[in-house]
Amino acid sequence: MAVYTDVAADELADFLKTYDIGELLSYKGIAEGVENSNFLLHTTKGSYILTLYEKRVAVDDLPYFLGLMAHLAERGVNCPQPARNRDGAVYSSLAGRPAAIINFLEGMWPRKPAVVHCAGVGEALARMHLAGRDFPLVRKNPLSVSGWQSLFAQAADRADTVQAGLSALLSTELDYLARAWPTDLPEGVIHADLFPDNVFFLGDHLSGLIDFPFSCNDILAYDVAICLNAWCFEADHSLNVTKARAFFNAYGRARPLSDAELEALPLLARGAAIRFLLTRLVDWLNVPAGALVKPKDPLEYVRKLRFHQAVTSARDYGIGASA
């Protein structure tokens, strides 16, 4: 979450009159994250999150994102629910941006994920994948292998200002991934951005999954690889095998990974590293002046990419022939 677009108090108060969620008491921007503008609202009826969708989110995709949250909640996955305005719509426009209001989930995201958190997110991810099987809408992933070259093009000429040799590293890896990317693994609804700051816990209990603007249809094990990168590495960018094993075991109890998925995992993890390396690099080079946002370090994912390049099998992640 972040704030790129400011909203005036009187403009927000008028906007809220189109909803039945009470009168505005206070609001504040949320600086965490890098994609959309988010505000915590307190009204006479409770607390809510207001999201103004920025750059990478197309308005035509909002029915998918918001509909998916409702679909998952109906099937026992705890995630925010969009509020409908008085016209019955789940999104409209505010400050020149598509905007939606969702209910506030209790909990905190884990600043230093422990083994119990990794197990919790593994189980929740698998249950989300299962719950999404009958979701009727389909959205292709614009940030999968077919979209990485265009992202690279936005940063190629300045990549070496971030780290010497980065442009060549990315070019070589992208060529390899384009040739090797699998096309025959199980697909379905994925979250595609399930980082620690998008998962809430109350104590050790997972209380909700949030932030669905990257959800789409893609390889399920690719979503697993994204979480491996996000949850199971330490601050020095080394893999914590104990965390990885807990994550995979919990996922596998709900949805066992096939041998083909396990075999492809190192490749998928390289792709997951490239995806976030590229988007972080583009963001790092293009943060708007004065934006209330903290760009994330792209070099974290250079180190993770190099780790996965040296991996020979899923056993290097702490799992055997089956999860």
Curated annotation (Swiss-Prot):
Pathway info: Amino-acid biosynthesis; L-threonine biosynthesis; L-threonine from L-aspartate: step 4/5
Lineage: superkingdom: Bacteria
Reaction catalyzed: L-homoserine + ATP = O-phospho-L-homoserine + ADP + H(+)
Keywords: Amino-acid biosynthesis, ATP-binding, Kinase, Nucleotide-binding, Threonine biosynthesis, Transferase
GO biological process: threonine biosynthetic process
Disulfide bonds: none
InterPro entries from the UniProt entry: Aminoglycoside_PTrfase (IPR002575), Homoserine_kinase_II (IPR005280), Kinase-like_dom_sf (IPR011009), Pseudomonas-type_ThrB (IPR050249)
Keyword Nucleotide-binding: yes
The protein's Enzyme Commission number: 2.7.1.39
Enzyme class at the top of the EC tree: transferase
MF terms in GO: ATP binding; homoserine kinase activity
NCBIfam families: PRK05231.1, thrB_alt
Family membership: Belongs to the pseudomonas-type ThrB family.
Protein name as catalogued: Homoserine kinase
